[in-house]
Amino acid sequence: MQNPFTLTFGKSPLEPIERPLQTMEIVDTFTAETVNQQMFIITGVQGSGKTVMMTEIARRLREREDWVVIELNPATDLLQGMLAKLNSNKVCAAIIKSAKIDLSFFGFGVAIEGVPPLTDTETAIITILEKLKKQDKRLLITIDEVTNNDYMKVFAGSFQIFVRQDLPVFLLATGLYENIDELQNEKNLTFLFRAPKIQLKPLNQQAVMNKYKNIFQIDQDVAKQMAELTRGYPFAFQVLGYLTWNHSGHYEAVIDEYEQYLSEFVYDKIWSELSQKDRIVARGIAETESGKIKEIREHLGMETNEFNPYRKRLMKKGIVSGETRGYVFFTLPLFERYVIDNS
């Protein structure tokens, strides 16, 4: 039997653990008869399941007859890419043809006699979206791992225009906290502040335990030990499952390899992107077993007003949880050991 787990980022595994509440929140909002929100941004650390969740939502909407779904590459000209995707989509291509929309200027189709060609990308997209609206169809655009580049700035400005013109276009994007924060602080793009952000938190521990128990046919105590080793971090769930599968279900035999995978695939990158002060605070958290903020500050010799900005930033990055008042803990499994070994 094939290994049901995967080590590939963004690939939907054979044995996923879904996030039903957050998934349904987005699907229900986008499909509501009266539209009051046309954009969601999914954030979280690398390996938290952002792409998998976005893919699942896109799949659900693609199955509906009144939806067109396209995916855009954030590293390329997004408006040009959007027009090309609309032109190559069967539903939109039929609309373009029947409405006699001349896109020959962009290299799509042939010139239509008696019809002036459209020469502005944004105008061409608006024309197609207006026809989609008349046919009671909606368009979902997905963009994975948005970054603050010129293509994204132009696209975000155009998307704002589409929404203002009451066009049936919806955006679902994923991104790391720092990239989203950088983008929404751009002049003229502050509307992104108002877009709902869904920060992916750890998976339900019971769900992780049940998954391991059923796949490996192990007793509850062993499944619980495995689940605790992952802390609900989706990539860790996949890595531990993958390695355990390859070792005939013996998870104790793979713990060193498991830790190495987490370090090389994720933690090295996370650590490299932290500032020196972030790292000092992270070390303080790692060295304070109780997790009490007061004890961490005393250990570091930092006042509250000096400590809090770094605590909040680590929380927004998804590295630290502050759900229990007065305490902070790492959300990532074995990250304490990594921090101490690397600082």
Indicate where each model-derived feature is located.
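A short, basic N-terminal segment
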Residues: 1-40, 334-335, 341
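Walker A/P-loop nucleotide-binding motif
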Residues: 35-56
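Conserved Walker B catalytic segment
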Residues: 114-178, 186
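Amphipathic alpha-helical "lid/sensor" segments that cap RecA-like P-loop NTPase cores
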Residues: 216-267
